[in-house]
């Protein structure tokens, strides 16, 4: 009798309409997935799964985000529900799309999460949405950064955003490499070794080189590389970020300002062992990369275990440029205009300086040209 009563109660629960409550707060970006989950449960309840295909694609456009989302809402041919400026739900027969957008300085990025009844409909919908975004769509590959940090209360926090992989590096900015910079990047991306350490003072081009590497990884992957990023010492002292990298889908782990993390373990470094396990393949991370940037002046201060062959691809000191190297960089950026290159270099460094950073040269390039002073004709003294 008790079993029969329990079964009757279970049947009553099944007959109840499915409902879900939502908190409209900072998690509004997840509303599309909540709606989709509701539909999935209903479909399973009647044994009719309607959305077996899932795709996630990204793009960027060099126009205001509001314009892009207005066009997606009005011109996609799908029923649209705008949640706020950068969040949109699109719905049609056999297809459902959640769109999230982010503003950048010179472009906006969009992430499309799409569910469809079949592959053909999914591909056709993606192509239609890209056409709506229009000719302003950035053709460069994107990479996705998951930034881990601590908030003002000391609690773990994160932010995820897309970056356009359009960084163009010139060899003249990296004379310390024994090969063209693109060749160096390609060798690292394809190498079995996971670790790359970039040493040097701020402004020498370490971050620019990291971005170019992530762009190359995206192009090689044929999709957006997923990057775990932090510069927070406290975050790295927790096991969770390492567990997420090992068990997740990230293609690279970038640790900036990692001075304390790279010092010798005999000097009290208790955090390096986690990276050694990942870099050594104790846990499987084939094809994934560990990139460190540090202000440590030379590799002699780094724990030797991290530099071991087979584990470390290279430890590169990205230094400041000599005056001659700075002039060659300026000349390259000025397309061979020697007069302009001399003005750029003069703006980037004082006459008593021996070195200049690549950042100082790039900054001088962005400054408007100074007008050339016009010489005044000599004054003629009037005579009686």
Predicted feature residues:
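Walker A/P-loop nucleotide-binding motif
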Residues: 193-210
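Pre-Walker A adenine-sensing motif
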Residues: 177-190
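C-terminal alpha-helical "lid" subdomain
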Residues: 83, 98-101, 314-384
């Amino acid at each position: 009798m008790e079993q029969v009563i329990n079964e009757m109660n279970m049947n009553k629960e099944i007959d109840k309409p499915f409902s879900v409550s939502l908190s409209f707060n900072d998690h509004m970006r997840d509303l599309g997935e909540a709606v989709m989950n509701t539909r999935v449960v209903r479909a399973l309840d009647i044994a009719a799964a309607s959305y077996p295909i899932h795709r996630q694609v990204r793009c960027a456009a060099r126009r205001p985000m509001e314009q892009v989302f207005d066009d997606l809402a009005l011109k996609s041919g799908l029923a649209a529900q705008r949640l706020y400026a950068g969040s949109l739900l699109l719905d049609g027969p056999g297809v459902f799309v959640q769109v999230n957008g982010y503003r950048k300085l010179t472009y906006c990025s969009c992430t499309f999460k799409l569910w469809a009844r079949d592959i053909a409909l999914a591909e056709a919908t993606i192509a239609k949405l890209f056409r709506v975004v229009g000719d302003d769509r950035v053709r460069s590959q994107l990479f996705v950064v998951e930034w881990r940090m601590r908030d003002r209360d000391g609690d773990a926090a994160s932010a995820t955003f897309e970056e356009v992989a359009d960084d163009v590096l010139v060899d003249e900015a990296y004379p310390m490499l024994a090969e063209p910079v693109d060749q160096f990047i390609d060798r690292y991306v394809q190498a079995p070794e996971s670790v790359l350490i970039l040493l040097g003072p701020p402004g020498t081009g370490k971050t620019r080189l990291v971005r170019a590497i992530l762009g190359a990884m995206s192009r090689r992957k044929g999709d957006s590389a997923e990057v775990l990023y932090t510069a927070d010492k406290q975050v790295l002292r927790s096991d969770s970020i390492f567990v997420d990298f090992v068990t997740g889908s990230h293609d690279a782990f970038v640790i900036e300002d990692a001075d304390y993390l790279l010092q010798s373990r005999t000097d009290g470094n208790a955090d390096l062992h986690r990276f050694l396990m990942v870099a050594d393949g104790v846990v499987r991370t084939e094809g994934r990369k560990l990139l460190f940037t540090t202000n440590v002046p030379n590799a002699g201060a780094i724990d030797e275990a991290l530099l071991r062959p087979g584990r470390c691809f290279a430890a590169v000191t990205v230094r400041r440029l000599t005056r001659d190297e700075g002039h060659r960089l300026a000349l390259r950026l000025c397309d061979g205009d020697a007069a302009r290159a001399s003005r750029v270099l003069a703006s980037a460094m004082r006459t008593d300086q021996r070195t200049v950073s690549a950042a100082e040269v790039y900054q001088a390039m962005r400054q408007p040209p100074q007008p050339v002073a016009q010489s005044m004709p000599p004054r003629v003294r009037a005579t009686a």
